[in-house]
Amino acid sequence: MIVTSIGGTTMDVRPYRIDPATARQSIEAGEAVVLDLTSPLIGSAIRGRIPGARWVSPRDILDRNRHTADLVRALPDLPRDKTIIAYCTCPDEEASARLTRVLRRQGYDAWTLIGGLPAWRAAGYPMEANAA
């Protein structure tokens, strides 16, 4: 958790985070769509992705010159009636946290996977081969 203190109140500056166990339950119940923001090289090094995850270029998400509307249009069709779970392998979940903020501003129920793909894998949860 990254925290800051404002007026004596400590708060997580990265809200809307979901732990791997809760994410897995949502995915297995068919309640979530998963977005993979790993770089292809890092994803390959980890040897896989969360089953059914849709890949999104982290470069596009981290490009501060792109407008929010452009980012949302560049994404695969996302259902508004499902939870969106984004993950990456960035330090401090940078790409997935930014995408989560963008999607929430657009009215999606979006969450960042705490610890990203490494945490999912460390928990021993299912992985599938990366798309060729």
Question: Which residue ranges define each predicted feature?
Answer:
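Short loop/helix-cap segments at secondary-structure boundaries that form the rim of catalytic
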Residues: 44-51, 120
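Conserved beta-strand scaffold positions in the cores of enzyme catalytic domains, especially
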Residues: 34, 53-55, 110-112
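Active-site regions of enzymes building and remodeling cell-envelope glycoconjugates
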Residues: 49-59
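Catalytic cysteine-centered active loop of the rhodanese-like fold, especially the PTP/DSP P-loop
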Residues: 71-121
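Short, charged, surface-exposed secondary-structure boundary motifs
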Residues: 62-69, 120-123
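Flexible, polar/low-complexity N-terminal or interdomain linker segments that lie immediately upstream
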Residues: 1-45, 130-132
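Short, hinge-like loop/turn segments at secondary-structure boundaries
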Residues: 51-52, 127-131
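Short, acidic/turn-prone active-site loops that include or flank metal/cofactor-
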Residues: 57-63, 115-117
